[in-house]
Amino acid sequence: MIQNQIKEQSLKVKMCGMRRKEDIAYANEVKPDAIGYIFFSKSKRYVTGQQARELDQNLDQKILSVGVFVNEIIEKVTEIANEVPLDVIQLHGDEDVIYIEQLRQQTDKEIWKAVRVKDTKDIKEAQQLPVDKLLLDTFTEEKDMYGGTGKIMNYDLIPKEGIRKPFFIAGGLHSKNIKEITEKVHPYGIDISSGIETDGCKDLKKMKEIMQITGGRHE
């Protein structure tokens, strides 16, 4: 058992970038609160709706399935959300209020919005969005880079008075820094991908380690 567990037992854990049967088997073993499928074709963790549906058939029903979309047309988002089916739609691109409101009219699924944080203004504006939860991620100038950078966000940008909406943090998280970061910013949850991989593939040992550190549901 890893020492110095995070005391806050309610910290949610989302493990993103599932694309192999082994990934789902690992998730079923360690039991994070949610897993993510990435439907952005430029991502190295990209899966199709059909692939996600086949993977999701073997996922423990207690684990939420989250679909990550980047500037996708709304009809395609709802099509995949119903096909898999997904529990949550996560928007990770440049989707604005109008887009989100239109999506709301076409689905009853929970909607999360990722925000690439460059300054405090980004967070303040994100709190006004009609979404259920936020995901604060690292800002990058790289073209077509929407998350998955493995780089740590500047957590000093999070307002000291807190954030009104429940929020996940992402970007460069791994077993060596999660405890310190979560104790500093007190997020609703963490979203981790590269931090549970070895050579680009999900690593069961690292997944177990994260769940132990966060006091998660791993048994």
Where in the sequence are the language-model features?
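Conserved N-terminal beta1-alpha1 strand-loop-helix module at the mouth
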Residues: M1-E219
